[in-house]
Curated annotation (Swiss-Prot):
Organism listed in the record: Caenorhabditis briggsae
Name this protein carries in UniProt: Bifunctional arginine demethylase and lysyl-hydroxylase psr-1
Quaternary assembly: Interacts with ced-5 and ced-12.
GO biological process: peptidyl-lysine hydroxylation to 5-hydroxy-L-lysine; phagocytosis
GO CC entries: cytoplasm; nucleus
């Protein structure tokens, strides 16, 4: 039975939440948000935590690049958030008080427009919902809005990810790259690969996230739910855990696509290398921050995808890199995907290369062999970002 207005603590919560739900997922109007009873029945099997963990204070940037970023090996880094103000400021109590009247993105409508809710109503919903796949705050514009930009001062980008080559592009032209993330149990992200060949990092401040990562070469049809399994929640993490996860854990799962599983806890930072499939579900109330980035180690993957998917951005970015980081041009020049005349023409790059004001983002649904020196390319589709709900980011880690 759907949550009634008497279950919320604020008098307007029911109306505000119902309005957001109607805009974000109108297809559930008749079916209902809690019909499957996952709040009571969802119980994944015991975790097999197989990810390496490394003390982030005891490894250098060069060692990280050599051991994890270059070979594209997922890892959890510990200790990187120890001195963040977010540890004290990102509690549910403080967030719901300081930002109570600020709107945060918790979905998208059928036209790609942001669905937003005031923090005070989302907090009420977060604590009291029984939904099968709850609304999830995934907000990429928090650092640009005057009344929420303080959130960006509560954390700092870890040293391993500071050299983001997209920083050299004008801010309004680069794709969305950072998200404030907040959600209850059963919220999460469907299986996806991060956009434009980027890698991602995700630092968790509150709660626990369950991750499954699958190697880049795994076929899309193998890692995605089958058509008959999608039901009313086709693009939700909980659907994946109720369907594909059972196959992933079975002895019949191909050994060449062996998954990495883990439970990320408070203060831990997940590194997701370029191309890895990953799916996330929150085990309880969670608060996190996540960024997508391009470095010298994954530029050979990012550049061909950017040329193909965001050609005007690629021309602008190339000019900026030539001015500020000319040493990386040899990586770009080695990419056979780069059209020889595309970087020197005089066409404008001010329109389609600009990122949307609605937190949208480009992405792929499958491993795209868009690395330097490789010619075969698969079709791009829309999916999502580093740890991002497909319903929320359907255009863009």
């Amino acid at each position: 039975m759907s949550l009634g207005k008497d279950r919320y603590s604020l008098p307007r919560s029911y109306k505000r939440v119902s309005h957001a739900k109607e805009k974000a997922r109108p297809e559930l109007r008749k079916f209902g948000w809690d019909t499957l009873g996952y709040a009571e029945s969802f119980n994944p099997p015991p975790l097999k935590d197989t990810i390496p963990r490394v003390d982030g204070k005891k490894i250098s940037v060069d060692e990280f690049r050599r051991d994890f970023e270059r070979p594209r090996i997922p890892v959890i880094l510990t200790g990187l958030t120890d001195d963040w103000n977010a540890h004290e400021k990102w509690t549910l109590e403080r967030l719901s008080k300081k930002y109570r009247n600020q709107n945060f993105k918790c979905g998208e409508d059928d036209h790609g427009n942001s669905v937003r809710m005031k923090m005070k109503y989302y907090h009420d919903y977060m604590l009291n919902n029984r939904d099968d796949s709850p609304l999830y705050i995934f907000d990429s514009s928090f650092a640009e809005r005057r009344k929420t930009k303080k959130l960006s001062e509560d954390y700092k980008v870890p040293k391993f990810f500071e050299d983001d080559l997209f920083h050299y592009a004008d801010h309004k032209k680069r794709p969305p790259h950072r998200w404030f993330v907040m959600g209850p149990a059963r919220s999460g992200t469907a299986i996806h690969i991060d956009p434009l060949g980027t890698s991602a990092w995700n630092s968790l401040l509150l709660g626990y996230k369950r991750w499954v990562l699958i190697p880049p070469n795994a076929p899309r049809d193998l890692v995605k739910p089958m058509a008959h399994e999608k039901g009313k929640h086709p693009d939700e993490g909980i659907t994946w855990f109720q369907t594909v996860y059972k196959r992933v854990r079975s002895p019949a799962w191909p050994k060449e696509y062996a998954p990495i599983e883990c439970r990320q806890g408070p203060g831990e930072t997940m590194f997701v290398p370029s191309g890895w499939w990953h799916v996330v579900i929150n085990e309880g109330l969670t608060v996190a921050v996540t960024h997508n980035y391009c470095s010298v180690e994954n530029l050979h993957l990012v550049w061909p995808k950017t040329v193909r998917g965001r050609p005007k951005l690629s021309k602008h970015w190339h000019r900026k890199l030539a001015e500020s980081r000319p040493e990386v041009l040899k990586i770009i020049n080695s990419c056979t995907d780069t059209p020889p005349q595309s970087l020197n023409d005089s066409s404008s790059d001010s329109s389609s290369s600009s990122s949307s004001s609605d937190d949208s983002s480009d992405s792929e649904t499958e491993e795209d062999s868009g690395r330097c020196g490789l010619g075969n390319r698969k079709r791009r589709n829309d999916v999502c970002t580093s740890e991002c709900p497909e319903k929320i980011s359907n255009s863009m880690v």
